[in-house]
Amino acid sequence: MANRDVERVGKKNRGANNNYFYEESSGETHWTSWLIPAIVVANLAVFIAVMFVNDCPKKITGPNKECVARFLGRFSFQPLKENPLFGPSSSTLEKMGALEWRKVVHEHQGWRLLSCMWLHAGIIHLLTNMLSLIFIGIRLEQQFGFIRVGLIYLISGLGGSILSSLFLQESISVGASGALFGLLGAMLSELLTNWTIYANKAAALITLLFIIAINLALGMLPRVDNFAHIGGFLTGFCLGFVLLVRPQYGWEASRTNTSRTKRKYSMYQYVLFVVSVVLLVVGLTVALVMLFKGENGNKHCKWCHYLSCFPTSKWTC
């Protein structure tokens, strides 16, 4: 909660910027968003590199197996029966850094906890995540700058990977969903910790909770890593209380009126800040220790597997 922002690069448009949900002071700073577009470009570049390495026509042989979109040459997709998302094979993803519990724990490849968030199972998976990132991330970066948003994105992605590794140990996992849910969690905690500056509190809260609920519900479908979503969301939720705190509404005006001096931050903002820092440090530390000790989260929580896939008459998990 420093008095001055360290993010000077890309700072623009100091002045009022109308927002339906909250009231802004005339001196509030807005940044040009460049990090989120750069992350999108990086993810696209990584996907192209993965498809180049995959080289489906060279590896797929036999009359009953055919690469999808063969006109793309070595960039063509695996057969739909193998990958319905129009992407590479599981072996290629594993080779390129997918999250795989045994390799992380027994082969000491902890870097996979971060590398997996730059990989995607297919073009549908990639486009869905990147469109969501643009929709969510650009607004946050414009309001809070690239340093804070970048930290939330990376640390939330790590948190999602850790929780996924603790509960899903028989499959590989890829995607930026954990980081995306971290941004959603940060948006929710930002709303709560900056509650006094919001003009349309109920509308903002209901809209955000609806988006979060729908996405978490979709995570209960088969082949979706909802543990990465939950881990990323919880990490981002705590980080929002730490990194996205705004001064109280009217604090700037009170600085020139000594008879009505107002504290820059409320007491509840300080409390949420401290509690969130403690939860983050303790939670990530305990989770990492459990992971590298080879613990299986399902043994400690018998019902938790329903959070990632809920069986119905239409599908099995």
Swiss-Prot record:
A GO MF term: serine-type endopeptidase activity
Location, primary (coarse class): Golgi
Compartment annotation: Golgi apparatus membrane
GO CC terms in record: Golgi apparatus; Golgi membrane; plasmodesma
Tissue expression: Expressed in roots, seedlings, leaves, stems and flowers.
Membrane topology: Multi-pass membrane protein
Alphabetic keyword roster: Golgi apparatus, Hydrolase, Membrane, Protease, Serine protease, Transmembrane, Transmembrane helix
Top-level taxon: Eukaryota
Protein's GO biological process: proteolysis
Keyword Repeat belongs to the record: no
Pfam families recorded: Rhomboid (PF01694)
EC number: 3.4.21.105
Annotated catalysed reactions: Cleaves type-1 transmembrane domains using a catalytic dyad composed of serine and histidine that are contributed by different transmembrane domains
Gene3D superfamilies: Rhomboid-like
UniProt note: phenotype after gene disruption: No visible phenotype.
Residue spans crossing the bilayer: 33-53, 118-138, 149-169, 172-192, 202-222, 224-244, 272-292
Residues of the active site: 177, 229
Function: Rhomboid-type serine protease that catalyzes intramembrane proteolysis. Can cleave the Drosophila proteins Spitz and Keren. May function in pollen elongation.
Family recorded in the similarity comment: Belongs to the peptidase S54 family.
Identification of the protein by name: RHOMBOID-like protein 2
Organism the protein comes from: Arabidopsis thaliana
